[in-house]
Amino acid sequence: MSPSAIHNITSDLPSSQQHRPFAGKVALITGSGRGIGRGIALELGKRGASCIINYAKSAGAANEVVAELAKLGSKSIALQADISKPADVAALFEKALKHYGHIDFAISNSGMEVWCEETEVTPELFDQVFNLNTRGQFFVAQNALKHCSEGGRIILTSSIAAQMTGIPNHALYAGSKAAVEGFARSFAVDCGRKRITCNALAPGGIQTDMFDENSWHYVPGGYQGMNIDTIKDGLAKMCPLNRVGTPADIGKIVCMLVSDEGEWINGQVLRCSGGGV
């Protein structure tokens, strides 16, 4: 990869045309009204992509992201869809295609994290988690394979929890994400006929509202109600870079994967944790 290409992918770029490598590209990002999805959309928008900002219920946060993207020169829209429902996923892609005419990048980010003692998991809770985290991502990938332009990109979202050991009461969530890693490897094969790549990200230690609610579980000796700064300090010490991650960190990784230079990365699960556990 050339130095100039690396600069374009990884820097905080101004919105000038010479630094907009994704101008003319369209990215559909599920669950992008907040958190990691929002961070991905903003990084893609900085680089010229038009974004479909998906939300499940409230349009407020999604519309705020659209407004932020407009300031960056990105012509984006907010579309509602409950990703746990395959019919909603199909309709989301159809609406996006009707608006833009094509989709180049599909980033499946919607998800939920739960902690529940295994003996207390009900069939209803199991279905709720797997319908969103697992089945939803399968049908995002399926529709992306059907509708994305040749040479496009599909990115699914796993979690470092899928490979971690020693975390109690986490089988339901970890299992829902581990399945996604299998999807990425298999879809990469089937997407090859359209030169579409498929990879999965396994983020860890990324500060979002979900992080604020749940990260105490990952800190040795952590407890509910623990001061968030204490949690951040504890997790930072578990990372060689001595910090927690941000949604922008994941957004920049996505920009690398969807770039022309990222084509040879395919069927992989990328652990995105700054080297931390």
Curated annotation (Swiss-Prot):
Which cystines does this chain contain?
Answer: none
What follows loss of this gene? Abolishes the production of scytalone.
The pathway to which it is assigned is:
Pigment biosynthesis; melanin biosynthesis
Name a GO molecular-function annotation: quinone binding
Give the top-rank taxon of the lineage listed in the UniProt record for this protein.
Eukaryota
Q: Which residues bind NADP(+)?
A: 36, 82, 109, 173, 177, 206, 208
Q: Which reaction does it catalyse?
A: scytalone + NADP(+) = naphthalene-1,3,6,8-tetrol + NADPH + H(+)
Signal sequence, start to end: none
Q: InterPro entries in the record, alphabetically?
A: NAD(P)-bd_dom_sf, Sc_DH/Rdtase_CS, SDR_fam
- Pfam families given for it? adh_short_C2
Gene3D superfamilies linked to this entry: NAD(P)-binding Rossmann-like Domain (3.40.50.720)
Induction comment: Expression is positively regulazed by the cluster-specific transcription factor pfmaF.
- Positions of the catalytic residues: 158-159, 173, 177
Q: Which UniProt keyword terms apply here?
A: Melanin biosynthesis, NADP, Oxidoreductase
Q: What is its EC number?
A: 1.1.1.252
- SMART domains assigned to the protein according to its UniProt record, in alphabetical order: PKS_KR (SM00822)
Which BP terms in the Gene Ontology apply to this protein? fatty acid biosynthetic process; melanin biosynthetic process
Q: Which family does it belong to?
A: Belongs to the short-chain dehydrogenases/reductases (SDR) family.
* Function per UniProt: Tetrahydroxynaphthalene reductase; part of the gene cluster that mediates the biosynthesis of dihydroxynaphthalene (DHN)-melanin, a bluish-green pigment forming a dark layer in the conidial wall that protects the conidia from UV radiations. The first step of the pathway is the production of the pentaketide 1,3,6,8-tetrahydroxynaphthalene (1,3,6,8-THN or T4HN) by the polyketide synthase PfmaE though condensation of acetyl-CoA with malonyl-CoA. T4HN is not stable and easily oxidizes into the stable form flaviolin.
Query: What is the name listed in the Swiss-Prot or TrEMBL entry for this protein?
Result: Tetrahydroxynaphthalene reductase PfmaG
Which source organism? Pestalotiopsis fici (strain W106-1 / CGMCC3.15140)
- Gene label: PfmaG
